[in-house]
């Protein structure tokens, strides 16, 4: 379990309210929770928290993809997460 996986991205980003910073922090929380849930499979409160954070990150990523596609693709490639699927 890595606590500060994206220190370089976080230290360069001074605006903590920016969409990129929020997505990076949510991604760190998601990775911590998934490693926790591998050992504690019946921790249903953590599962619910993980689903809530996933939804928040998905909403932020969809907002960023609509507003600035270039920043969205750079962030997706940096964090190594999948691109959003549209319905």
UniProtKB/Swiss-Prot annotation:
Any Pfam family hit: Ribosomal_S15
Domain of life: Eukaryota
Keyword Cytoplasm: no
Keywords tagged on the record: Chloroplast, Plastid, Ribonucleoprotein, Ribosomal protein
Subcellular location: Plastid, Chloroplast
Entry-linked InterPro entries: Ribosomal_uS15 (IPR000589), Ribosomal_uS15_bac-type (IPR005290), uS15_NS1_RNA-bd_sf (IPR009068)
Any one cellular-component term (Gene Ontology): ribosome
Keyword Ribonucleoprotein: yes
GO biological process, any: translation
Gene Ontology molecular function: any one: structural constituent of ribosome
Disulfide bonds: none
Family: Belongs to the universal ribosomal protein uS15 family.
Cited HAMAP family: Ribosomal_uS15_B
NCBIfam families (UniProt xref): S15_bact
Subunit structure: Part of the 30S ribosomal subunit.
Name of the featured protein: Small ribosomal subunit protein uS15c
Organism: Oenothera biennis
Gene: rps15
